[in-house]
Amino acid sequence: MPPYPLLHRIDSPFDLRKLDRRELPALAAELRAFLIESVSKTGGHLSSNLGTVELSIALHYIFDTPEDRIVWDVGHQTYGHKILTGRREAMSRLRQFGGISGFPRRSESSYDTFGTAHSSTSISAALGMAVAARNRGEQRRSIAVIGDGAMSAGMAFEALNNAGDMRDINLLVILNDNEMSISPPVGALTKILARMFSGRTYNAARRAGEKVLGVSPPMLDFARKVEEHVKGLITPGTLFEEFGFHYYGPIDGHDLDALIPTLQNLRKLNGPHFLHVITRKGQGYKLAEADPVLYHGVSTFDHTAGIQTAKGAAKLTYTQVFGDWLCDIAAQDEKVIGITPAMREGSGMVRFAQEFPNRYYDVGIAEQHALTFAAGLACEGFKPVVAIYSTFLQRAYDQLIHDIALQNLPVMFAIDRAGLVGADGATHHGAFDLSYLGCIPNLVVMAPADENECRQMLYTAYRHNGPAAVRYPRGGGMQVGPETAMSALPIGKGEIRRSGHRIALLVFGSLLFNALQAAEQLDATVANMRFVKPLDVTLIEELAASHDLLVTLEENIVIGGAGSEVARVLESLSDRPQLLRLGLPDTFIDHGDQSQLLESVGLDAPGIVAAIRRRFSPDNN
C-alpha cells in the first residue's frame, strides 16, 4: 500500500469527487503530511499551504473545476491545489530549475485559471471572468480566494466596489483569514449561521420578502436594516454587505463539516457573495503552528527535527547590511523613519522595528500609499527610508514620479531583490528597475558591487537632498565586510578595479565578481560604475578613447537599462569603440537557483567571456 493511499488515487478533481464525503478528513491528513514531507525536500512556502488544505479540498470537491474558475490571490498557498489537480509527482521539482512554479501559472495547468504572485489581484480577475461568463450566457462560477493581508490593499476594495453593483454575476469571494482564531461558542454559532444564510430556503424567503415589501419601499428598507443589524451583532461582515455582497461566516476553514455544506449552498446562489473562513498558518504541524513566520518560506530541512539554526558564521546578505545600516543611522538621526509595505522580515527591518518602534511603519500591502506617505514625511523635514522589493516598487510607479521625483523630495529607497531572485521566478525577479528608474528626472540610482559599498551607498542616499535609490540583489555578494565608518561617495563617479588592454568591462552592480573573473581571461579593464544615474560620463569617455570594445554588464533587462545609457553617451563621440551590452534578455525568466539562472542567460564568468569572444577577436579587429 502506498504511504498516502487516498491521495495516490487522485490525479484530478474528478477523482476527488468520487470519494465519499466521510473520507475527506483522512484525505486532508494525508495531503498535509505529503506537503510537509515534500516541501521539506525542495524548500518553498509551508505555513500558508498547511493552512489551506481543507479549503483546497472543499473547493475542488464542490465546484466543477476547471469549468468553474478559482483564482488564488498571491498564489503561494496553492501547493494543495496543485497536488489535487494532477501535479503530485511534479512536486519533487517544485521551484527548481525546469520544475513547476511555486505560484499558479496558466501555462502549467488549465486549473491555474490566472497567474498570480503579487497580491490583491484575485477579485478583479475573478470579476472579469464572471462578467465574461454572464456575457456568454454561461452558468459557471468564479471564485476568488484572498488572504486577510491581501484584502487590506486598495486594489481589492476597488474590485469589491465594482462587483457589488452587479447583481447578475456568479462571483464568490472567499476571505482566507489566518490572523485570528474562533473561540468555540462563536465558532459553533457562526457555523450554523453560515449554513442558514447560505441556504436555499433562507435566500428564497429573502427574495420573496423583497418582492412583497417592494410595494412599500420604507418597509423594505426597514427589513434590510433589521437583517443587517442582526447579522452585524454576530458577524464582522457589515463592511462587505455595504459593498453589495451577501456575507457569510466566519466559519472554521479547517472544519470540512462546515465548509462543504456552506459551499454547496453558495454554489446554488447567483450574485456577488462573500464567505469568511478562519484558518491557521502551519495547521497540523506543531513546529509551524508555533512559529508560522519561520516556516513561511523554508529551505530544505529535516521535517522530524524541524529547522535548525545554522552553526558557524552565516553568510552576510545585502538585506542584513541594510538592516544594520538603518539602525546605525537611526541612532544618529531621530528624523529617520523606516517604512515597509508588509515586508518587515524580508527587507531586514525586524531589529529596527524592535529598537525604534515609534519610527517604524509597516503600512501593509499598500505600495502606492507607502511612497506618498513617505513624500508627506519628507515635506515636513523627516528622512523617510522606504524598504521595498524591486518587483513591488513597480506597483507604485506613478507615486514615485508624481509625488516624489517631480517635487524633488528627499525620499530614500532601499530596493531589495534586484536582479534574479531565484526560486520565486518571473513574478519576483527585479529585472526592470534600472530601466524604469533611469528615465525619471531628479532621481539618483546606485548599484553596489559588494556589501561595504552597499553600506556607503545607503549613507550617500541618506545624505543626498533629493530622491535616491540603492538597488541590491537577494542574498550575499563578494563578502566584503562593511566598514563601521560611513562616508558619502561622490555622486556620479565610478572607479577602475582592474587595468587591461583593448577591452573594458563597465559593470553596474552585482556582476563585478563575475566580470573580474572574466577579465583575467581577456586581460580586460574593469570599471565599477557604481551610479546608473547620473552616469560617470568622464570615465566612459576615457575608456572609449583607450579601448576597442566597451562591454556593459548589468543584472537588469538590456532594453532601456544602463547599457542603453552608455550607448547614448557614445553616440556623441566622433571616434567611438564597439559596444556590447550584456544583461537580461527580453523574456520572462523562470525560477531556479540564482547561479543556474545567471549561467542560463550567459552572465556567469564563462558566459561573459564567450559573448565577448563571439563579438570581438583581437586578431581580427
UniProtKB/Swiss-Prot annotation:
Mg(2+) binds at D148, N178. Its cofactor is Mg(2+); thiamine diphosphate. Pathway: Metabolic intermediate biosynthesis; 1-deoxy-D-xylulose 5-phosphate biosynthesis; 1-deoxy-D-xylulose 5-phosphate from D-glyceraldehyde 3-phosphate and pyruvate: step 1/1. The keyword Transferase applies. Its EC number is 2.2.1.7. It holds the Pfam family DXP_synthase_N. GO terms for molecular function: 1-deoxy-D-xylulose-5-phosphate synthase activity; magnesium ion binding; thiamine pyrophosphate binding. Binds 1 Mg(2+) ion per subunit. Binds 1 thiamine pyrophosphate per subunit. It catalyses: D-glyceraldehyde 3-phosphate + pyruvate + H(+) = 1-deoxy-D-xylulose 5-phosphate + CO2. Thiamine diphosphate binds at H76, A117, H118, S119, G149, A150, N178, Y285, E367. Keywords: Isoprene biosynthesis, Magnesium, Metal-binding, Thiamine biosynthesis, Thiamine pyrophosphate, Transferase. GO terms for cellular component: cytosol. One of its GO terms (biological process) is isopentenyl diphosphate biosynthetic process, methylerythritol 4-phosphate pathway. InterPro entries: Dxylulose-5-P_synthase, THDP-binding, Transketo_C/PFOR_II, Transketolase-like_Pyr-bd, Transketolase_BS, Transketolase_C, Transketolase_CS. Catalyzes the acyloin condensation reaction between C atoms 2 and 3 of pyruvate and glyceraldehyde 3-phosphate to yield 1-deoxy-D-xylulose-5-phosphate (DXP). Belongs to the transketolase family. DXPS subfamily. Homodimer. NCBIfam families: dxs (TIGR00204), PRK05444.2-2 (NF003933). This is 1-deoxy-D-xylulose-5-phosphate synthase. It comes from Aromatoleum aromaticum (strain DSM 19018 / LMG 30748 / EbN1) (Azoarcus sp. (strain EbN1)). The lineage of its organism: Bacteria, Pseudomonadati, Pseudomonadota, Betaproteobacteria, Rhodocyclales. The gene is dxs.
